[in-house]
Amino acid sequence: MTQFDGSLLATAAVSAPEVMVKLVTPVIECFAELSHSERDILFDTFRVWVQNDGSLRVAGELLFCHPNTVRYRLHRIEQRTGRSLSRPRDIAELCLAMEVHRRLMWQTWDHDPPIPAR
């Protein structure tokens, strides 16, 4: 059973699973080669940054790291995906792709369950 936890992204992510996986795979397949822990760090950093309105300072505090570390991790996401975190459309695509990964695709990359959204 899938919990939607009131999130439009969660609802969109699981509404048509096969279609969503096909749509977002090109966006995030560049992370598949990373270790589970390295991928989690990047995905968690992005999620916390988005949830805090793009504040590097707040994201750093919540992740127990310096804002420059958050900036570096976000830059790595931009480099890997070819998307810019200064463009709202790119941010939206990454949000959806990471939500689909968290809810539907994590099993194809590793065997650990996804970290629940905070």
Locate the predicted segments by residue.
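Cytosolic nucleotide-utilizing catalytic cores of signal-transduction proteins
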Residues: 1-118
